[in-house]
A protein has these predicted regions:
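Helix-to-loop junctions at the C-terminal end of transmembrane segments
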Residues: 50-62, 260-273
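Helix-loop boundary and gating motifs at the non-cytosolic
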Residues: 1-37, 217, 221, 226-243
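Cytoplasmic helix-loop-helix junction between adjacent transmembrane helices
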Residues: 95-130
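C-terminal membrane-cytosol helix-exit motif in multi-pass small-molecule transporters
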Residues: 160-186, 385-389
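Structural signature of the two symmetry-related core transmembrane helices
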Residues: 65-79, 275-290
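Residue-level signature of mid-helix packing/kink "hotspots" within the transmembrane helices
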Residues: 44-52, 136-137, 254-258, 262, ...
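Helix-breaking motifs and short loop linkers at transmembrane-helix boundaries and internal kinks
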Residues: 62, 83-88, 294-295
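Paired small-residue
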Residues: 77, 88-96, 304-312
Length: 393
């Protein structure tokens, strides 16, 4: 597992460095809020388009080669941003990076699920979440600040850090061979291909439809949370009149998300996930509403309120990520972990992309406060889905 965590940290370093800065680069080239919102929106659209094919790629080529390809696609285009600040070029780089990010996200969570016994999934997801969150804690707030003090080039250089994860792929490949994890991917394919008709005849319904039904609730809840997070990560540097407030807000957001995602996993292993979901949904709604209030006056950000609001959303953002992945894995059998991981990651990235595009589009026509209130209303609409009982597969 350490090899997977190191590789994941490297990959997400490249992802996090550019997340708030690539939209700023588009604004530097003349794009408006809507155009800059599409930078991350298209990144995640390409991610979502890639993710359904990743389980097949893992079975066909193996985990280490697929991960290496993903890291190259994610980190390689970063320095190419320096060629042009025009929106079309930046969007093309977003597509390439999205391919790599789609591979990294599904492969990482699927491999994690197979490496760790189900009884320890919550704690393992917490550790995996920390390897994702720590780079974001450092690089999300640092990115806009580094642009101000040193220029865009240094952030684009940091974005290439994903390629450093290649050093851990041989180590991970050896661990997977020792634990015979690759065989599990092939066993899953065999079960899916030979057992689907038998299961369907016995139950009177298609098994994939039943799986989709089980995964729908956690996926929609996840989308409500990541819509909020995607909006704040993309636009915090643009919605605050004080650059240091934007950096501080992103720092509060990412630290809160990291701690929440890390700590809640082991707690959920003991008490279950559902008890914590509805309070976290409400926390996200309150945080978004307070953010809207903090940036009501474009020229005078209420800095303290802004920091508190982003921290509240961060707690919800991190906690809901962990709990919904735990519920998704618990809703399926072990040979369906690849499907559950792909669906969860699609929900994560769809919510993030929708938040980026939706809030950017509304802000371009109105302003950020009403855009954030719309995001809060969407998150609130997921609340009825946050009440449930534990299910054991």
């Amino acid at each position: 597992m350490p090899a997977l965590l190191l590789l994941t940290a490297a990959g997400f370093s490249g992802y996090a460095a550019l997340l708030p800065v690539a939209p700023l680069w588009a604004v530097h080239g003349g794009a408006d809020e809507a155009g800059s919102g599409f930078v991350n929106g298209l990144l995640l659209l390409a991610t979502i388009a890639t993710q359904p094919f990743v389980p097949w790629l893992l079975r066909r080529f193996g985990t280490a080669p697929v991960l290496a390809t993903g890291l190259l696609f994610l980190g390689g285009p970063s320095l190419l941003h320096l060629i042009s600040d025009q929106l079309g070029w930046i969007l093309a780089m977003s597509v390439l990076r999205g391919f790599g990010f789609g591979i990294l996200t599904v492969t990482g969570s699927t491999t994690l699920a197979h490496l760790v016994p189900p009884a320890r999934h919550g704690a393992a997801i917490g550790a995996y979440g920390a390897s994702i969150a720590v780079p974001q804690v450092v690089l999300l707030p640092a990115g806009p600040w580094l642009v101000d003090v040193a220029g865009y080039w240094i952030v684009f250089a940091l974005g290439a850090a994903s390629i450093l994860g290649l050093a851990a792929t041989p180590w991970l490949a050896r661990v997977l061979r020792e634990q015979d994890v690759e065989r599990l991917f092939h066993d899953a394919a065999a079960v899916d291909s030979t057992g689907a008709d038998i299961q369907a005849q016995a139950s009177g319904s298609h098994p994939q439809r039943r799986i989709a039904g089980r995964l729908a609730r956690p996926t929609i809840l996840l989308m409500g949370a990541t819509l909020a997070g995607g909006a704040l990560i993309t636009f915090a540097p643009q919605m605050s009149s004080a650059p240091l407030a934007a950096a501080g807000g992103l720092a509060f957001f990412t630290v809160a998300a990291a701690v929440s995602r890390w700590r809640i996993g082991s707690i959920a292993d003991r008490y279950g996930a559902w008890a914590f979901l509805w309070p976290l949904v409400l926390l996200a709604v309150v945080g978004l509403a307070l953010t809207a209030l903090a940036v009501e006056n474009p020229g005078d950000t209420k800095v303290t309120l802004f920091l508190v609001a982003l921290a509240l959303v961060g707690i919800a953002y991190g906690g809901i990520q962990n709990l919904t992945l735990l519920l998704s894995l618990g809703a399926v059998s072990r040979n369906q972990y690849g499907t559950a991981s792909a669906v969860w990651n699609i929900g994560f990235d769809a919510g993030t992309g929708i938040g980026s595009v939706l809030v950017g589009t509304i802000a371009a026509g109105l302003s950020f406060p009403p855009a954030l209130l719309v995001a809060a209303a969407i998150s609130l609409a997921t609340l009825p889905l946050a009440f449930g009982r534990e299910r054991h597969s």
